[in-house]
């Protein structure tokens, strides 16, 4: 095929109006293993042919009219219908001795998806916005750099589209739409550019609507132009031009709104749609993008990642979820998803969201119960709080920082995933468990209990505000339960303050170590429980062997591990000790605690039975009972 490149052939109908030579052109769309490897090229009737014709500067004539017939200037076939002229062409080829063979074959052909009728591609005169004139493409690429794109990779996507897109064809031949409102000179084919004409069109459209253009458009020409010289164009605007114009009639027409918009939000397919048209119109009219930030999301699919379809029976309807599970489960699912990809939904996924919701709700319910009767008079100073409470405040500071960062970046999944982990691992499985004894058994005036309830109050306040955008009704219910019907809605409140003094990285590092050590101890307790040595951790006495002296000083490990007593030994690890791979320098032995069980706090202590009146209580519980009686 390459040997033919540059050669020319005579047209088979030479002398009959086709006296031009036909060039041989190399085309990447032609396959050597299909057919002859030689195909007819018509730049007016195919995308690949058009591109090839543009590359080699071939003419692109309008040969076929709207009714499917050849134009009057086409030799031999003027007025013939493109689908009814085959026999005539074959006869002319035969008469010209240019027909090598004829045969009916079956091959793929473009067709209408609705009517199933065959189709042809054809070029027609259209109106375009040039991306090169006035440097529109360059302006758009510069504007992209000044926009915040979420997710960040969407910036490269729209940037590549702007770099490679052709000029924007803004005209359409449809019966309904916004008219182009252009007059073209019949001889020169140039559009009429006259400010007074445009102003008359604007005033008419403002009064009569877009239909004004179709009601005697010659009236807009005024006295300066002869209607006989001009033809009104009845094409309509590309609907993407309409959508891209929303910046004009939504933002600029409303004084309470600002331009550019804070955010444009749509599906990922709108990079070449609404986002693109808005960008080009913004740059073309205002020299800037019409938005400060753009968020794009994927599409909802079923649990297997398949597109939803009624025929497949895999449609998950939001209203059905709202009726059966409640709208908050649906909202929680939304913030739990990575919306930069397609969002999967189905029964198992929603069941997981129910579990997450239940964790949040149970956390709020526990805090509400523990805060019964709490007032601000219980507040101790930060310096007087135990290290455990100060660690929780540090975690609140971390989460508050994360909340603000994630909401600014529209990364809701990262925050609410972290918040669920906080409620599950930090609160329920650790802090609440450790402080249950303090809340239920310590004196109301004890500094540790006051500090605990103060932190509970701060926890509840922050959790409610963080969850308010998602669990709107649950949070309002908890808010009213805490403060009563007289308090204004939480949704009218600002976020609570998070003092910088709560931040304590050194303490956080200590608690990373403490919790790892605690996991070794609780691992040993689980083994003892499974062996039947104890039934609960409060029945245990624990000895921790720490020959490398890694255990932290001034820490009540018995309290953290929820045991009745705990000793630390620096002796070598005995062979019978429980050893964890996480801390292989620690060994733990569990034995049954000595003493009697306090019937109030359930700790097993030797002091139980020593008091003459309260013989079933430990010293701490005796003191509390005496205080309230």
Where are these regions (language model features)?
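Residue patterns forming the tRNA-binding/recognition surfaces of aminoacyl-tRNA synthetases
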Residues: 6-8, 17, 33-194, 212, ...
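Alpha-helical recognition segments enriched in aromatics with Gly/Pro capping
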Residues: 56-68, 174-176, 184-187, 195, ...
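Residues immediately within or flanking Cys/His clusters that coordinate Zn2+
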Residues: 109, 182, 595-598, 615
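Short cysteine-rich clusters marking metal-coordination/redox-active sites
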Residues: 112, 185, 221-226, 598, ...
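Cys/His-rich microdomains that often coordinate metals
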Residues: 119, 192, 605-608, 622-625
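Cys/His-coordinated zinc-binding microdomains
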Residues: 173, 227, 602-605, 619-622
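Acidic, turn-prone loop/beta-hairpin segments
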Residues: 184, 230, 374-405, 432-524, ...
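Short linker/helix segments within small regulatory modules
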Residues: 607-616
């Amino acid at each position: 095929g390459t040997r033919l490149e540059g050669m020319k052939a005579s047209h088979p109908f030479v002398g009959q109006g086709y006296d031009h030579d036909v060039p041989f052109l190399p085309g990447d769309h032609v396959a050597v293993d299909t057919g002859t490897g030689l195909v007819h090229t018509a730049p007016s009737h195919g995308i690949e042919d058009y591109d090839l014709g543009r590359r080699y500067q071939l003419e692109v004539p309008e040969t076929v009219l709207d009714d499917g017939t050849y134009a009057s200037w086409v030799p031999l076939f003027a007025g013939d219908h493109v689908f009814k002229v085959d026999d005539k062409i074959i006869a002319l080829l035969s008469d010209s001795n240019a027909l090598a063979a004829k045969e009916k074959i079956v091959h793929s052909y473009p067709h209408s998806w609705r009517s199933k009728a065959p189709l042809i591609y054809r070029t027609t005169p259209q109106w375009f916005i040039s991306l090169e004139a006035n440097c529109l493409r360059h302006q758009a690429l510069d504007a992209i750099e000044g926009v915040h794109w979420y997710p960040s990779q969407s910036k490269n996507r729209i940037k590549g589209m702007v770099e490679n897109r052709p000029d924007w064809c803004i005209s359409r031949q449809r019966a309904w739409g916004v008219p182009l409102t252009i007059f073209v000179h019949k001889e020169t084919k140039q559009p009429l550019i006259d400010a007074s004409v445009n102003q008359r069109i604007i005033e008419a459209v403002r009064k009569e609507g877009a239909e004004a253009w179709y009601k005697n458009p010659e009236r807009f020409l005024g006295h300066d132009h002869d209607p006989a010289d001009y033809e009104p164009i009845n094409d309509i605007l590309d609907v993407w031009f309409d959508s891209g114009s929303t910046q004009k009639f939504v933002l600029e027409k409303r004084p309470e709104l600002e331009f550019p918009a804070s955010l444009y939000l749509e599906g990922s397919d709108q990079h070449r749609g609404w986002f693109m048209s808005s960008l080009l119109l913004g740059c073309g009219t205002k020299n800037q993008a019409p938005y400060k930030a753009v968020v794009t999301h994927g599409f909802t699919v079923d649990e297997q990642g398949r597109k939803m379809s009624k025929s497949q029976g895999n449609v998950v309807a939001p209203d059905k979820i709202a009726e059966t599970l409640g709208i908050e489960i649906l909202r929680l699912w939304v913030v739990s998803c990575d919306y930069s990809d397609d969002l999967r939904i189905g029964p198992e996924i929603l069941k997981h969201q129910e579990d997450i919701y239940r964790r949040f709700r149970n956390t709020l319910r526990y805090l509400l119960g523990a805060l019964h009767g709490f007032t601000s008079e219980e507040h101790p100073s930060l310096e007087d709080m135990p290290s455990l409470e100060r660690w929780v405040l540090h975690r609140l500071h971390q989460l508050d920082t994360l909340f603000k960062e994630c909401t600014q970046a529209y990364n809701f999944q990262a925050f609410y995933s972290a918040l669920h982990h906080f409620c599950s691992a930090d609160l329920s499985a650790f802090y609440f468990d450790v402080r249950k004894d303090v809340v239920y058994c310590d004196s109301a005036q004890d500094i540790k209990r006051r500090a605990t309830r103060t932190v509970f109050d701060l926890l509840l306040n922050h959790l409610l505000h963080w969850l308010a955008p998602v669990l709107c009704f649950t949070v309002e219910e908890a808010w009213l339960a805490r403060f009563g019907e007289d308090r204004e809605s939480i949704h009218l409140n600002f976020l609570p303050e998070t003092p910088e003094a709560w931040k304590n990285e050194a303490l956080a590092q200590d608690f990373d170590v403490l919790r790892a050590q605690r996991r070794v101890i609780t691992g040993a307790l689980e083994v003892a429980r499974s062996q039947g040595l104890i039934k609960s951790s409060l029945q245990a006495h624990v000895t921790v062997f720490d020959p490398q002296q890694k255990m932290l000083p001034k820490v009540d490990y018995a309290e953290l591990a929820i045991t009745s007593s705990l000793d630390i030994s620096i002796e070598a690890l005995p062979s019978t000790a429980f050893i964890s791979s996480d801390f292989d320098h620690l060994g733990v032995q569990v034995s049954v605690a000595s003493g009697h069980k306090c019937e109030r706090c359930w700790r097993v202590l030797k002091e139980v039975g020593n008091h003459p009146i309260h013989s079933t209580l430990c010293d701490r519980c005796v003191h509390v009972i005496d205080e309230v009686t």
